Amino acid sequence: MPVRFERKGKLDYVINDNGAWCWFQDERALVDPETQALVVGSIAAAEGPDGERRAGNVELTVVDLASCTARVVVLHDAFEVDDHDVPALWRREDGRWLAAYTKHKTDDLLRWRISEPNDPTAWGPERTFDWSAYTEHRGVTYANLHELEGRLYCFSRAVNDDPCALVSDDDGESWAYAGKLFTRPKVGYVNGYTRYAAGEDRIDLITTDHHPRDYDNSIYHGYLAGGILHRSDASPVQARPFDAAGDAPSQVELTTVLNAGERLGEVALTHAWTSDIRRAPDGTIAATITARGDDRPADPEDEFSRLRPVLDHRFVYARQDPGRGWTRHSLGKAGAGLLPHEQDYTGLAVIDPYDVNSVYMSTPFDPRSGAETPHHEIYAGTTADGGASWTWVAVTQDSEVDNLRPIVAPGDPSRVALLWFRGEMTASQHFRCEIVLRDTARSSSMGAGA
């Protein structure tokens, strides 16, 4: 039964009292402009309200934006308590919703469900695709649903822990293995961490070499269009990507966006990680990246120590305007590693899908003054000069808990549906967080609502 939101300020509402998400799945949230429904996926934890019953649930919060009510729908009960398992969403032309999700490398199944027409609260049975013939039972992680040229892709981390894809030519009713997007000899935990952005005629992506705790990553960009994998300058990398019978290229053959060790101002950036990518209708591409700032330990052997504290991360805004190369500008400090055993986790910075000049970032440093705050706060930033300078407004302030991992849900260009979760997170499997929504008209101010 739908329940009315719990208001947390003048503008902010709690729409789910137990949930969190990772950031390597998309779209994690979508708006249907016709029905004014917003859907966002999350995982419930044992530490949260009703945790004994809900722990590990793959949940969708279905929000009626017109009536300010929300309903939590369970896609899979007691699935796995891990924020890496959140579903990717896609809305079909027939009004049905598709949700796809995996475990965090603990089995080899992609799971998906399809809703009733125009009703994301009513779902058909769960179906599965077994990757094990390709992964040799080493597990699969993440789902990303993007359409290109009439074909639906589901990008996952799978074979050799490389970015791979399944394809569907029937709107997600069935799936077939396409192949690897790119590959290279494995270092440490996994290979490239990839973020995707789909447009009308191409899918753009940014990726890393490996996990930042295992490798001093650079960041690379490419795009899929016309059946070809391209570099940023449109030169071809591979004429037949996903050729299951052949081998995929290495991501180093793409265009380098940020070099490991590159300096922005007086700070050397290392161990970079992908956060978000969006492409504007005019062809401008923007990406947000996190990196360690001046983090070369005195003993080089300590650089890849898993539990060594990393005290300084930076947010980077990278951009390619039409006909030009990539530029890189600092967004500000991202703070120390969010978790002791995950030194490269941050609150994240993301891009408005309808305005690449607008970003939202979660940080314990106020970008207006540089002052450190007791908790991670959300800030909205706008640029008028391609990222060289920014004007900031606080979305949250004086918080008693951290505000983390913002999302601007696409689907309705007339509104800014800003989501984040707030609370305490000690691991991807342990958190007590609630999901917050701020829904405003695009022309409205995004200032603090508390």
Regions found by a protein language model. Name each.
Residues 2-450:
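Extracellular, repeat-based ectodomains that mediate carbohydrate processing or recognition
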